[in-house]
Amino acid sequence: DKRTKKVGIVGKYGVRYGASLRKTIKKIEISQHAKYNCNFCGKDSLKRKAAGIWECKACKKVVAGGAYVCSTTAATTIRAAIRRLRDAHES
């Protein structure tokens, strides 16, 4: 049985800090505790070690990422730009 219906992981804060702040924190905490896909071994075992440090539990690789999410939107944009430039350079 579920203990909470809507508060989820931020139930630990109880009535403190205000509803909208707790809602924001809920999104962050869910993403930071989630398991992500490892680019090296392909398994869903990349977990947050510290702010911006992500470690794969399977292959023990450590990668830098976002503070709360493994890959940031800025990093994705840069990666796409680099790939596009590399393809243009090769052809």
UniProtKB/Swiss-Prot annotation:
Query: Which residue stretches are annotated zinc finger (C4-type)?
Result: 38-59
Q: What would be one Gene Ontology cellular-component term for the protein?
A: ribosome
**Gene Ontology biological process terms from the UniProt entry:** translation
Q: Which family does it belong to?
A: Belongs to the eukaryotic ribosomal protein eL43 family.
Q: Extract the Pfam families matched here.
A: Ribosomal_L37ae
**Which Gene3D superfamilies does this chain map to?**
2.20.25.30
The answer to keyword DNA repair applying to this record is: no
Extract the SUPFAM superfamilies matched here.
Answer: Zn-binding ribosomal proteins
The name this protein goes by in its record: Large ribosomal subunit protein eL43
| Gene Ontology MF term list | structural constituent of ribosome; zinc ion binding
> Which keywords describe this protein according to UniProt?
Metal-binding, Ribonucleoprotein, Ribosomal protein, Zinc, Zinc-finger
- The residues that cross the membrane are none
Q: Which InterPro entries does this entry report, sorted A to Z?
A: Ribosomal_eL37/eL43, Ribosomal_eL43, Ribosomal_protein_eL43, Ribosomal_zn-bd
